[in-house]
């Protein structure tokens, strides 16, 4: 069957901001799909609220709308554009839920719009727990005993019948949100109550727990002619009970017999056929390790995180082909883009092992609940490819960027056996390292298997790694041992550690014996056919398949796994940089380790190396490719941190030079540079120990801002008000980077703004100034930003532009630079300079129309701004107002305080644009899910230093019809000033405290501030948690509340008696 001619215009729904459970994999899927549909001649309309994506670039679709993904706005766009069809399956859970909402509102029927890919009935059957159960029974597919409940009492009754433990799964939620394993009635009541609230249809599935079974996933495709195939099967290292997004995963499956594989494969194909899905689908199954008994856990009737992993693991472009299937093409008439000769109907075969390890945010959230369960907590993931499991696992470990180069954390050697066993049983994000430590201590793999239910096969591989470590210890400088260790994925750094040498000694020894890695191609067919793809991984074998071309090449380093502080924005810059390199006539090579992103799509670059971003792995690629140079500006802190060691090894770093990078990062050098350039900065000093820090604070005067140098995303940054707090900070936080000193700065509580600039060394283009809504003290990544600035005088803007220019030229910046300023009493101070692409590049590129990363790359390659037709200085402002607003994932992270401060906590961003500030703010709040009713009750619980400011806000809220509620101290202050407020009870006062009022739906918003120090108190944290759990808008900075008030006031009519 060929493609459909009866539809011309297709709307694609994106997945919105990055949150835990829904990350960059949907940017990858959406980009692929839009391009595939355009390739087939359809007109594509894209709607997505996330500006930090490649998908929302103008050239990806015919029309791109960056608007809130709410029924109100999507409906408007549909009525304006009148698409013939909508493709919702590439927008994750957001896309599916939007399709359901459009259907329920009657919009699809009313406008005669068809849903492509997955029919509504299939979404319903896969997502609605009751219908899913019925379908499985019809297909004779086993599922765990379960019941659907709409109340907590129903859950309790069922659990009493079948016994504990049970699993709670809310319907229509993402990444296991609201679910969990319950081993007691108390846990069941709590989790079910929460789950029912989070489910849009107030429905939960309560099922018998099959924790301990093997968790297996099949990624399947089907077309309209009922052809179906398995693209990839994957096996979780962790048994059932831990969300697959938080599990280590291997592809292909490692421990299944042929019979088991065929049995589960048949089940998966039977399910996709019954659902009549046209496109991709993910089936999760649980297999009893001791029999042929299995259960179907769940089905995702859409492209998912696992399909991004499967695409990268096999090279088979699932999203691209799913989009083409949705418009009627069939698997037997499309060629596989990797080989160019075989058809898409040909199931991929792998002659290597792929390992995926999740990346968790607990380096940022030290107090977060780290125990893993059915609710996802990872922000991103890394993938590595090897010829054996050990090699791929160890490569993945060193890709994580958590300070390890092996499956070993040195700090664990000091813990007691008792703690070790507890951590092995109760899985946390770092269980792999505890398991490996247990094996090093001599625990048998049989003991560990009975404690963890992890398959002996996997534990035996961990044992094998430890045996190689022991062999290396016994045979120092032994060539055969070195060869063996390299074959199984050991890094030079680890071997050096064991042999008590420097990493450079191991590298020299390898080179003297011509022991280099070779690069193998990912070709989907286990080398059975010729492949055309330039997609490679390293291994220690004989035949090298990556041939150096005659063209001069440039290597771009990616940004590794997505984590808080380093998100998809850096991938955006990487992809744009590659486009510019190709346009300039060079071969563009990408090196990255993140399977979710667009940059690791093999069609983006001329060559892709899927490798860890470590000195050794990067140097190996450089030794083979001999590029003209390496670009480190677009890979965030990951790439910048490699610049020095690469430069020391004689590699050409293109763009800003290492010594200039150092002048921006090193405190003393930076201060000196600012003095020379005549640019003011907050008074500050460097300290290497407690005494120096106290001395510095005394000299500067409290409050001071303290932080380690060389960090990203405000890691371990705090505002301290007195000596005791400073001592406490130094004892707990300074370990963030021991060889670098800490910085002690005068804390200026003023207006913040930031600038991204592009420099060729002589001229500087400043696309725009972004003004932060929150004052200093909230991390720039967590602030709402406005462009163009609304409250900065022309003079201040000119000063900012002038300082930016001086900095760019004075620091010899070639390419990108980001500068942050604080303004107090009309005086502009520089807070920090980052001589690299920052997280605001995609936003600013979109709103100004300047392709910043591409221009920066052209300058890095030797062109000037004048050559490119750009003037020196501040670019003319946009006529519209644009807001960038942060998005948080607190619902997924128990015990992480949602109080905003100098350490970054947001996982993603949205954008709102319109003709006025109020309209743009309204869109931004709608897009990040902070919908506030026109009237209701608002609670104020305010620190002393901001009560006066809060009073004027409370008066304005009252004027538009809100009832003001307040805690004791705040209510008393308001009353003194003539504003009466309803008193709420102290925490623990069961009937009237804030958490209880919130739970019963009596509170529409909470304003809660904690004073300049921004540290959490227990009561405050309970209040904030209750707001997060119940989805009540919470403002921990008065500026954000003021912005929301501006929106509400603009939507109110003036009602006054005459």
Curated annotation (Swiss-Prot):
<keyword id="KW-0479">Metal-binding</keyword>
<feature type="domain" description="ATP-grasp 2">
    <location>
        <begin position="671"/>
        <end position="861"/>
    </location>
</feature>
<feature type="binding site">
    <location>
        <position position="241"/>
    </location>
    <ligand>
        <name>ATP 1</name>
    </ligand>
</feature>
<feature type="binding site">
    <location>
        <position position="778"/>
    </location>
    <ligand>
        <name>ATP 2</name>
    </ligand>
</feature>
<feature type="binding site">
    <location>
        <position position="752"/>
    </location>
    <ligand>
        <name>ATP 2</name>
    </ligand>
</feature>
<dbReference type="GO" id="GO:0044205">
    <property type="term" value="P:'de novo' UMP biosynthetic process"/>
</dbReference>
<keyword id="KW-0028">Amino-acid biosynthesis</keyword>
<keyword id="KW-0665">Pyrimidine biosynthesis</keyword>
<dbReference type="GO" id="GO:0005524">
    <property type="term" value="F:ATP binding"/>
</dbReference>
<feature type="binding site">
    <location>
        <position position="208"/>
    </location>
    <ligand>
        <name>ATP 1</name>
    </ligand>
</feature>
<feature type="binding site">
    <location>
        <position position="707"/>
    </location>
    <ligand>
        <name>ATP 2</name>
    </ligand>
</feature>
<dbReference type="GO" id="GO:0046872">
    <property type="term" value="F:metal ion binding"/>
</dbReference>
<feature type="binding site">
    <location>
        <position position="176"/>
    </location>
    <ligand>
        <name>ATP 1</name>
    </ligand>
</feature>
<feature type="binding site">
    <location>
        <position position="129"/>
    </location>
    <ligand>
        <name>ATP 1</name>
    </ligand>
</feature>
<dbReference type="GO" id="GO:0006541">
    <property type="term" value="P:glutamine metabolic process"/>
</dbReference>
<keyword id="KW-0464">Manganese</keyword>
<dbReference type="InterPro" id="IPR013815">
    <property type="entry name" value="ATP_grasp_subdomain_1"/>
</dbReference>
<feature type="binding site">
    <location>
        <position position="834"/>
    </location>
    <ligand>
        <name>Mn(2+) 4</name>
    </ligand>
</feature>
<feature type="binding site">
    <location>
        <position position="210"/>
    </location>
    <ligand>
        <name>ATP 1</name>
    </ligand>
</feature>
<feature type="domain" description="MGS-like">
    <location>
        <begin position="930"/>
        <end position="1058"/>
    </location>
</feature>
<dbReference type="Pfam" id="PF02787">
    <property type="entry name" value="CPSase_L_D3"/>
</dbReference>
<comment type="similarity">
    <text>Belongs to the CarB family.</text>
</comment>
<comment type="subunit">
    <text>Composed of two chains; the small (or glutamine) chain promotes the hydrolysis of glutamine to ammonia, which is used by the large (or ammonia) chain to synthesize carbamoyl phosphate. Tetramer of heterodimers (alpha,beta)4.</text>
</comment>
<feature type="region of interest" description="Carboxyphosphate synthetic domain">
    <location>
        <begin position="1"/>
        <end position="401"/>
    </location>
</feature>
<feature type="binding site">
    <location>
        <position position="284"/>
    </location>
    <ligand>
        <name>Mn(2+) 1</name>
    </ligand>
</feature>
<feature type="binding site">
    <location>
        <position position="779"/>
    </location>
    <ligand>
        <name>ATP 2</name>
    </ligand>
</feature>
<feature type="binding site">
    <location>
        <position position="780"/>
    </location>
    <ligand>
        <name>ATP 2</name>
    </ligand>
</feature>
<keyword id="KW-0055">Arginine biosynthesis</keyword>
<feature type="binding site">
    <location>
        <position position="834"/>
    </location>
    <ligand>
        <name>Mg(2+) 4</name>
    </ligand>
</feature>
<comment type="function">
    <text>Large subunit of the glutamine-dependent carbamoyl phosphate synthetase (CPSase). CPSase catalyzes the formation of carbamoyl phosphate from the ammonia moiety of glutamine, carbonate, and phosphate donated by ATP, constituting the first step of 2 biosynthetic pathways, one leading to arginine and/or urea and the other to pyrimidine nucleotides.</text>
</comment>
<dbReference type="GO" id="GO:0006526">
    <property type="term" value="P:L-arginine biosynthetic process"/>
</dbReference>
<dbReference type="GO" id="GO:0004088">
    <property type="term" value="F:carbamoyl-phosphate synthase (glutamine-hydrolyzing) activity"/>
</dbReference>
<feature type="binding site">
    <location>
        <position position="298"/>
    </location>
    <ligand>
        <name>Mg(2+) 1</name>
    </ligand>
</feature>
<dbReference type="InterPro" id="IPR005480">
    <property type="entry name" value="CarbamoylP_synth_lsu_oligo"/>
</dbReference>
<protein>
    <recommendedName>
        <fullName>Carbamoyl phosphate synthase large chain</fullName>
        <ecNumber>6.3.4.16</ecNumber>
        <ecNumber>6.3.5.5</ecNumber>
    </recommendedName>
</protein>
<feature type="binding site">
    <location>
        <position position="832"/>
    </location>
    <ligand>
        <name>Mn(2+) 4</name>
    </ligand>
</feature>
<feature type="binding site">
    <location>
        <position position="820"/>
    </location>
    <ligand>
        <name>ATP 2</name>
    </ligand>
</feature>
<comment type="pathway">
    <text>Pyrimidine metabolism; UMP biosynthesis via de novo pathway; (S)-dihydroorotate from bicarbonate: step 1/3.</text>
</comment>
<dbReference type="GO" id="GO:0005737">
    <property type="term" value="C:cytoplasm"/>
</dbReference>
<feature type="binding site">
    <location>
        <position position="284"/>
    </location>
    <ligand>
        <name>ATP 1</name>
    </ligand>
</feature>
<dbReference type="InterPro" id="IPR036897">
    <property type="entry name" value="CarbamoylP_synth_lsu_oligo_sf"/>
</dbReference>
<feature type="binding site">
    <location>
        <position position="175"/>
    </location>
    <ligand>
        <name>ATP 1</name>
    </ligand>
</feature>
């Amino acid at each position: 069957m060929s493609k459909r001619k009866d539809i011309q215009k297709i709307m694609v729904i994106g997945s919105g901001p990055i949150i835990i459970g829904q990350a960059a994999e949907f940017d990858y899927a959406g980009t692929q799909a839009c391009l595939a549909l355009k390739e087939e001649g359809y007109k594509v309309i894209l709607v997505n609220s996330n500006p930090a994506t490649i998908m929302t670039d103008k050239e990806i679709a015919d029309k791109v709308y960056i608007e809130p993904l709410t029924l109100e706005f999507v409906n408007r766009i549909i009525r304006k554009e009148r698409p013939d069809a909508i493709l919702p399956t590439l927008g994750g859970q957001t896309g599916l839920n939007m399709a359901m909402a459009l259907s329920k509102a009657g919009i699809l029927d009313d406008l005669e719009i068809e849903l492509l890919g997955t029919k509504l009935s299939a979404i319903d059957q896969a997502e609605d727990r009751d219908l899913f159960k019925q379908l499985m029974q019809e297909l004779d597919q086993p599922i765990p005993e379960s019941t659907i409940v709409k109340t907590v009492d129903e859950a309790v009754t069922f659990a009493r019948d079948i016994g504990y433990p049970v699993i709670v799964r809310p319907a229509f939620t993402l990444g296991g949100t609201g679910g969990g394993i319950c081993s007691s009635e108390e846990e069941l009541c709590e989790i079910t109550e929460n789950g029912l609230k989070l489910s849009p249809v107030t429905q939960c599935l309560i099922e018998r727990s099959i924790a301990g079974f093997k968790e297996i996933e099949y990624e399947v495709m089907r077309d309209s002619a009922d052809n179906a195939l398995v693209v990839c099967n994957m096996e979780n290292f962790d048994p059932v009970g831990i969300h697959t997004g938080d599990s280590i995963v291997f592809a292909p499956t490692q421990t299944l017999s042929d019979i088991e594989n065929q049995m589960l494969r048949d089940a998966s194909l039977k399910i996709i056929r019954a659902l009549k899905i046209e496109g991709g689908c993910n089936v999760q199954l649980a297999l009893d390790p001791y029999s042929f008994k299995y259960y179907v856990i769940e089905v995702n009737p859409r492209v998912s995180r696992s399909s991004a992993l499967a695409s990268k693991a096999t090279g088979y472009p699932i999203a691209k082909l799913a989009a083409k299937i949705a418009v009627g093409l069939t698997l037997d008439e499309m060629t596989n883009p990797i080989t160019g000769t075989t058809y898409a109907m040909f199931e991929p075969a792998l002659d290597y092992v792929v390992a995926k390890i999740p990346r968790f945010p607990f380096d940022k959230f030290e107090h977060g609940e780290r125990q893993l369960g059915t609710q996802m907590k990872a922000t991103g993931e890394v993938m590595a490819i090897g010829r054996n499991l050990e090699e791929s696992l160890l490569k993945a470990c060193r890709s994580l960027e958590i300070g390890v180069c092996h499956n070993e954390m040195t700090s664990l050697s000091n813990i007691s056996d008792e703690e070790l066993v507890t951590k092995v049983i109760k899985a946390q994000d770092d269980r792999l390292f505890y398991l490996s430590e247990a094996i090093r201590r001599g625990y048998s793999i049989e003991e560990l298997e009975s404690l963890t239910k992890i398959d002996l096969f996997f534990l035996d591989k961990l044992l094998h790694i430890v045996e190689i470590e022991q062999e290396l210890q016994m045979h120092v400088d032994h060539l055969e041992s070195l060869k063996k260790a390299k074959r199984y994925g050991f890094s030079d750094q680890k071997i050096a550690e064991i042999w008590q040498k420097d990493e450079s000694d191991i590298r020299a020894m390898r080179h003297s014996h011509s022991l280099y890695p070779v690069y193998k191609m990912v070709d989907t067919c286990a080398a059975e056919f010729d492949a055309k793809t330039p997609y490679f991984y390293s291994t220690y074998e004989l035949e090298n398949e990556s041939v150096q071309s005659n063209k001069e090449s440039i290597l771009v380093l990616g940004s590794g796994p997505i984590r808080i502080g380093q998100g998809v924005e850096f991938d955006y810059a990487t992809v744009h940089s590659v486009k510019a390199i190709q346009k300039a006539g060079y071969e563009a090579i990408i090196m990255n380790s993140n399977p979710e992103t667009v940059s690791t799509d093999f069609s983006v670059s001329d060559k892709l190396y899927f490798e860890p971003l470590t000195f050794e792995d990067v140097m190996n690629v450089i030794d083979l490719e001999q590029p003209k140079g390496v670009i480190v500006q677009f890979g965030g802190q990951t790439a910048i941190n490699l610049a020095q060691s690469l430069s020391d090894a004689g590699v050409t770093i293109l763009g800003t030079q290492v010594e200039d990078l150092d002048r921006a990062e090193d405190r003393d050098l930076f201060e000196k540079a600012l003095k020379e350039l005549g640019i003011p900065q907050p008074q500050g000093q460097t300290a290497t120990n407690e005494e120096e820090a106290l001395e510095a604070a005394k000299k500067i005067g409290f409050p001071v801002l303290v932080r380690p140098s060389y960090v990203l995303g405000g890691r371990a940054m705090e505002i301290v008000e007195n000596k005791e707090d400073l001592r406490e900070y130094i004892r707990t936080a300074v370990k963030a980077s021991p060889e670098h000193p800490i910085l002690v700065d005068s804390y200026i509580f003023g207006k913040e703004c930031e600038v991204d600039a592009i420099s060729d060394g002589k001229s500087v283009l400043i696309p725009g100034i972004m003004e932060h809504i929150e004052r200093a003290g909230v991390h720039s990544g967590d602030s709402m930003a406005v462009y163009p600035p609304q409250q900065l005088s022309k003079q201040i803007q000119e000063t900012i532009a002038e300082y930016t220019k001086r900095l760019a030229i004075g620091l010899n910046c070639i390419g990108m630079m980001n500068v942050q300023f604080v303004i107090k009493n009309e005086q502009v101070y520089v807070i920090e300079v980052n001589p690299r692409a920052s997280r605001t590049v995609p936003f600013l590129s979109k709103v100004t129309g300047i392709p910043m990363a591409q221009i920066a790359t052209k300058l890095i390659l030797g062109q000037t701004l004048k050559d490119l037709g750009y003037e020196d200085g501040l670019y003319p402002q946009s006529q519209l107002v644009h807001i960038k607003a942060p998005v948080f994932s607190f619902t997924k992270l128990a015990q992480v305080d949602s109080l905003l401060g100098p350490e970054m906590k947001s996982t993603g961003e949205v954008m709102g644009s319109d003709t006025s500030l109020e309209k743009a703010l309204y869109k931004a709040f709608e897009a990040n899910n902070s919908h506030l009713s026109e009237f209701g009750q608002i609670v104020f619980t305010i620190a002393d230093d901001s009560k006066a400011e809060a009073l004027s806000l409370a008066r304005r809220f009252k004027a538009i019809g809100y009832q003001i509620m307040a805690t004791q101290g705040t209510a008393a202050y308001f009353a003194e000033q003539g504003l009466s407020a309803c008193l709420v009870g102290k925490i623990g006062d069961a009937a009237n405290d804030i958490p209880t009022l919130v739970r019963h739906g009596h509170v529409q918003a909470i304003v809660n501030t904690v004073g300049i120090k921004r540290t959490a108190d227990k009561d405050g944290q309970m209040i904030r948690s209750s707001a997060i759990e119940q989805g009540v808008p919470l403002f921990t900075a008065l500026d954000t509340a003021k912005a929301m008030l501006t929106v509400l006031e603009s939507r109110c009519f003036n009602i006054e008696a005459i």
